Amino acid sequence: MMEQYYELKAQAQDCLLFYRMGDFFELFFDDAKKASAILDIALTSRGTHIEESIPMCGVPIHAAESYLARLIKAGCRVAIADQVETPAEAKKRGGSKALVKRAIIRVVTAGTLTEEALLDSRAANWLVAVARAGSDFGLAAADISTGRFETIALSEGRLDSELARLSAAEVIAPESLVQQEAYKNRIPQAVELSNECFNSPHGEARLKSIFKISTLDGFGIFSRAELAAIDGLLAWLDRAGQGKLPFLQQPVRRAYADHMLIDAATRSSLELTASTEGRRDGSLVSSIDHTVTGAGARLLTADLGAPLMDIDVIHKRLDLVEFFFYDTLLREDVRDLLKGSPDLARVLGRLVAGRGTPRDLSLLRDGLNQAFILYEKLFSLEHKPALLEQILPDFRGHGSLVDLLERALIEQPPIDATQGGFIAKGYDHALDELRSMGGESRRAIAALEATYREKTGINTLKIRHNNVLGYHIEVPSRHADALMQANSGFTHRQTLAGVVRFNASELHEQAIRATQAGVQAIAIESKHLACLIESTLEKRDNIAACADALARLDVSAGFADCAVQKNWTRPTVDDSCCFDVIQGRHPVVENALVKSGERFVANNTNLDPKNRLWLVTGPNMGGKSTFLRQNALLAVLAQTGSFVPAEKARIGLVDRLFSRVGASDNLARGRSTFMVEMVETAAILSQATNRSFVILDEVGRGTSTYDGLAIAWAVVEAVHDINACRCLFATHYHELTQLTSRLPALSLHHVRAKEWQGDLVLLHEMAEGAADRSYGIEVARLAGLPPVVLKRASEVLAQLENSSGKNNDSSANLSDLPLFGVQAFQTVLPQNNPLYDAVSELDADALTPRQALDIIYRLKELAAKDKVM
């Protein structure tokens, strides 16, 4: 057996090997050690190898999916070695000692999952292949759980943004690329494949073969890099399926001109689909997700990741949202019907992958039925939006398949097909007869129990069944002697503690009839299952289109529901360079405030070609960063086809969105906080066009004051004069306000704050003009800095402001300030203070624990009287 294991393990390469033994998948050697640690299961041993025990652990087959999920989450890949013949077939082939044949039937990786238990129903599961041809790059991406398949040709500079958009579960790349220092951290944890797996001509040939076409012209013109990426992707899928490819829809070629460009840094800072902690909660998608199906949630995430550039398509989406927005009853009816709709795309994915079950077929039947009910409800409506007219035909045309599945399957089929019982009565008369025969035999067996009790006088006699003995008679040990007699008519089979088991000729005959009928019935049902799956897969493209249409309907109705509940409005999206928002709100922050019973302070934004750059000043915590992000998110929502949180909004098409907000570092790539800031700012200045929207927060703060001011000054000028884009620029450098005299499209704005009875009140309101001060020390007081530090800061600030007013050398004046030591401390805590005196008199080394406790209480009383600390 171990020889067979070694052979299979060699094929598995870097994967853990699940080796089937009976009802368990066993792991050996280092695989066992690694798996037992991850799964927290017992590590045992079996036999020896080179005079050492072989480590072993195992998981039951019926629970294998849950264990697989944990291993995949831990970053493992698992090869499944299953039995490919029965023990009976093995004996027939090689005698009683023949080893059952096993083979690797599948390799399970993070990007090749199809099982419902292993996937997040509300998130896509992308497998991405990266390839390079010359200076060009290509990506090929597939979600095999739904069949989605897309490619994109891109430059090296856009690689990070596309990988960030897809948020792939698994990335594969040529070994020559991954091993280059420049890409090790840009393609993290990529699976290395040999360079031969990324061959452009071979990729083209594979595509033609899969879709049975002679030319790719109907799909578009693929670049060499795209075809190489396709080849790598299909090679990995071929390995994972051991020669069986999953369902893939026709590849969709993405073009940058079709979607708003959002780089990786901007996606992260705006938290579009994941918070800074990497969770869905707290992100934009989580705050606006009112979808009721997993497919709808996945499409919503995809839409937010790629806002549209086609105004006509944006308007079509907005029209459908508005249609549901104003018809409450229709919206609620549609959403109720969608709630009961199965995930057709993932059901189809399992069927194509060969892992479909009778339950999956019933889900498909019910889902297509729901689609037709929706069709009937929506088709008769007047003044339907164009997008609804476009997707409605995909809801119908499945009648023959639904009729077949309704006739063939019972209402609630089991997941496990091996025990039969899922084909409906009346679908196959021969099957019905076998079931009848089996039923008669089982009834006869039940009657035999009463007969044997009467014959033997043993009232506790029972007829039982198990997988080893089949049907048998069981009596308590004290009654066994009578049945042991040669003329009793019973044959001894097994003796256990407390019971003895027997057989009888009549029981044996009936058992054979029941077993044969059952085996034949299961065989017939298995054939029917295969035929039903084959008939279903003939309609795979139509089913996939229906699934996509249901998801689009769910997203649109969900947008409408969100807009109604949160008082959002339809934006006007046009080809101008305006950005005019009345009473706009931050969708995520407002959502959090509403939950805590607070109100979000709305603000206006008005950018146009003559007033396209706002310089925003004001205190920390005043809401500058929130205001910046809020407007960026409004652009994303509008071009996604959603209503927006505002009273009114007109948004000129944004081709590229950039955000330089928040401080972070990238130690893995050797970059400090300031270096990251400069790299991101450089990307903005080199890529932003006059149609872009840019938010910049505190540029230059990561270095010395004068260096930072100089950089910020130059960046403002470049954004104004060279990029000429719409930009919100938040800063604490008040010197930048002088630029209004030189830059005609720049205007000054600030977030309002006021002092009330010695406290700082942050109003979170935008107003014209520059802030008169930054209120930094007041914010520090709100944050809880010690009074002694605040006092010292006030002294330093006063000296700096005084020297600035006199236009003197501030460094010379600062040298006159006392050091932040005893002298500075005494300016806050004079020596004649009782608390100071009490502390000075202490001899800490001579105190007992009791004395120390008494002194603590005394000091607390003194502090209460004289609120110094």
UniProtKB/Swiss-Prot annotation:
Signal peptide: none
Record GO biological process: mismatch repair
InterPro entries (alphabetical): DNA_mismatch_repair_MutS, DNA_mismatch_repair_MutS-lik_N, DNA_mismatch_repair_MutS/MSH, DNA_mismatch_repair_MutS_C, DNA_mismatch_repair_MutS_clamp, DNA_mismatch_repair_MutS_core, DNA_mismatch_repair_MutS_N, DNA_mismatch_repair_MutS_sf
Binding-site residues for ATP, renumbered to this chain: 618-625
Molecular functions per Gene Ontology: ATP binding; ATP-dependent DNA damage sensor activity; damaged DNA binding; mismatched DNA binding
Listed SUPFAM superfamilies: DNA repair protein MutS, domain I (SSF55271), DNA repair protein MutS, domain II (SSF53150), DNA repair protein MutS, domain III (SSF48334), P-loop containing nucleoside triphosphate hydrolases (SSF52540)
Keywords, sorted A to Z: ATP-binding, DNA damage, DNA repair, DNA-binding, Nucleotide-binding
A cellular component term, taken from the record's GO annotations: cytosol
Record carries keyword Ribonucleoprotein: no
Pfam families: MutS_I, MutS_II, MutS_III, MutS_IV, MutS_V
Family stated for the protein in its record: Belongs to the DNA mismatch repair MutS family.
Function as written in the Swiss-Prot or TrEMBL entry: This protein is involved in the repair of mismatches in DNA. It is possible that it carries out the mismatch recognition step. This protein has a weak ATPase activity.
Stored NCBIfam families: mutS1, PRK05399.1
Protein name: DNA mismatch repair protein MutS
Organism listed in the record: Zymomonas mobilis subsp. mobilis (strain ATCC 31821 / ZM4 / CP4)
